[in-house]
């Protein structure tokens, strides 16, 4: 009987991916392979490996957007090869960025929204640092004119996200972070004023504190700074870290005065990929007016074909996220943003009431007075057979990722779990989550933990 060898080309075209030669061995992981691989095979290996990631829609720890419309996917694909920094080559992408800047300036009540300055960034952390840099430069210029030293700048804030710690270290600024004490978990006017001096470059309230999700009292702090100036002459500006609240308060709490309606507010940063509803990779910083951004911070570059002003901590980046942000502004308008976020707030309040009914949890934040989220701790004196780190790990077996963490210094004794309610998290999903939490509680009642997990062992920690 004659033997017939397969045609190699036919073999490559017709063989099932998983019976192919490429997938008969493990592909290299830490060294670049010597030979090429079929694109279908390389894709399938990576696709299958990514299944090991968590389901982003069940990630209730992250602030970042995990659901976008099909049109956003299309626009992102159309912009995959556009470098937004090259404004001469892609002038219309630059125009869309400019429109977003002025829309946000208007949304945040800039007195000169048509002419003020602002820019997109990779996220709210970069935007926050740019706002902080502008504060430092303005303070330094003021001190030089007064003939005073400029070597000991400080900045005052409440419990902040790690980007501000990075900013303070990288730019050699003393960070006067107001610690949590007792039941006070955010900044207060009194705590701010006792830390102010002539070297304070600015006060940075957070509109949506990472740890508790509350809004800090921007207007009350502003009024306290007004009084301080009357009494001492110290004129201290404010930057608002509105990473979350900047895309929430204007739509769901429009009467709250936190933005450029307050004269001391010189700049605001926000995250487009959080409650701005855009895909990952876009933030915004807007200045009150052009005079609030020192001209020395702006670079003009011409090596991409045209002269372009730029203020950023990076350079090349994709334009798709900016285009997607503009799409959301057109697609949703103020009414659409309000409807989406109000639905999230309503679900957060509902979750709070349902989780409280379980009986062993103390609700720390119920979705009112901050961002659409909720958090809880174990009631004092209750021993349910688990701690919150154990619960975070157990609920993960059902796919849910819920942050569990101890509070910052002076309240490390308080451990909480936090849920972010984002666009795409429905009331039905909330019911499924509550049912799974009940099953976890019942499991621990039958199988109590004698030695509970700690924060390092738990997989449910996230402040991003």
From Swiss-Prot:
Q: Which residues carry this modification: N6-(pyridoxal phosphate)lysine?
A: 274
Q: Does the keyword Lyase apply?
A: yes
Keyword DNA-binding found: no
* Gene3D superfamilies referenced in this protein's UniProt entry, alphabetically: 3.90.1150.160, 4.10.280.50, Type I PLP-dependent aspartate aminotransferase-like (Major domain)
Alphabetized, the UniProt keywords read: Decarboxylase, Lyase, Pyridoxal phosphate
Q: Which GO terms describe its molecular function?
A: glutamate decarboxylase activity; pyridoxal phosphate binding
Which Pfam families does the UniProt record give?
Answer: Pyridoxal_deC
User: Which InterPro entries has this protein been placed in?
Assistant: Glutamate_decarboxylase, PyrdxlP-dep_de-COase, PyrdxlP-dep_Trfase, PyrdxlP-dep_Trfase_major
| GO CC, any one term | cytosol
User: What CDD domains does the database record attribute to this sequence?
Assistant: DOPA_deC_like
- What EC class is this? lyase
Similarity comment text for this entry: Belongs to the group II decarboxylase family.
The task this protein performs is described as:
Catalyzes the pyridoxal-dependent decarboxylation of glutamate to produce 4-aminobutanoate. Has weak activity with aspartate, but cannot complement an E.coli panD deletion mutant.
Task: Quote the protein name from its UniProt record.
Answer: Glutamate decarboxylase
Source organism per UniProt:
Aliivibrio fischeri (strain ATCC 700601 / ES114)
Lineage summary:
Bacteria, Pseudomonadati, Pseudomonadota, Gammaproteobacteria, Vibrionales
């Amino acid at each position: 009987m004659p033997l017939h060898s397969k045609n190699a080309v036919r073999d490559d075209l017709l063989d099932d991916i998983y019976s192919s030669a490429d997938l008969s061995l493990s592909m290299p992981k830490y060294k670049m392979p010597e030979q090429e691989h079929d694109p279908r095979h390389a894709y399938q290996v990576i696709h299958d490996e990514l299944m090991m990631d968590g389901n982003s829609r069940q990630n209730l720890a992250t602030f970042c957007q995990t659901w976008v419309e099909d049109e956003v996917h299309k626009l992102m694909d159309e912009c995959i090869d556009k470098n937004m920094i090259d404004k001469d080559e892609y002038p219309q992408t630059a125009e869309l960025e400019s429109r977003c800047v002025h829309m946000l300036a208007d949304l945040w009540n800039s007195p000169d929204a048509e002419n003020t300055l602002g820019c997109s960034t990779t996220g709210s952390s970069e935007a926050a640092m740019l706002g902080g840099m502008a504060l430092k430069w303005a303070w330094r210029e003021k001190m030089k004119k007064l003939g005073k030293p400029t070597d000991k700048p400080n900045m005052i804030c409440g419990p902040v996200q790690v980007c501000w710690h990075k900013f303070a270290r990288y730019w050699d600024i003393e960070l006067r972070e107001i610690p949590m004490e007792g039941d006070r978990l955010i900044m207060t006017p009194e705590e701010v004023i006792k830390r102010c001096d002539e070297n304070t470059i600015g006060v940075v309230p957070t509109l949506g504190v990472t740890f508790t999700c509350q809004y800090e009292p921007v207007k009350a702090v502003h009024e306290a700074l007004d009084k301080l100036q009357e009494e001492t002459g110290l004129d201290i500006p404010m930057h608002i870290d509105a990473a979350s609240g900047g895309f929430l308060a204007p739509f769901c709490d429009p009467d709250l005065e936190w933005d450029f309606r307050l004269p001391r507010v010189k700049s605001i940063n926000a995250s487009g990929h959080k409650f701005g509803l855009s895909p990952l990779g876009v933030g915004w910083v807007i200045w009150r007016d052009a005079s609030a951004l020192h001209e020395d911070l702006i670079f003009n570059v011409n090596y991409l074909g045209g002269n372009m002003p730029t203020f950023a901590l990076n350079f090349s980046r994709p334009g798709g996220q900016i285009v997607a942000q503009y799409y959301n502004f057109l697609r949703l308008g103020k009414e659409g943003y309000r409807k989406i976020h109000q639905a999230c707030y309503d679900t957060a309040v509902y979750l709070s009431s349902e989780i409280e009914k379980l009986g062993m949890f103390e609700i720390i934040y119920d979705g009112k007075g901050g961002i659409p989220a909720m958090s809880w701790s174990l009631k004092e004196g209750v021993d349910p057979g688990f701690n919150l780190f154990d619960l975070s790990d157990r609920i993960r077996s059902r796919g849910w990722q819920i942050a569990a963490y101890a509070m910052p210094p002076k309240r490390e004794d308080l451990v909480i779990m936090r849920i972010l309610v984002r666009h795409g998290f429905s009331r039905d999903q909330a019911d499924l989550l509550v049912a799974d939490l009940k099953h976890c509680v019942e499991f621990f009642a039958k199988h109590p933990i004698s030695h509970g997990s700690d924060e390092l062992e738990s997989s449910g920690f996230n402040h991003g």
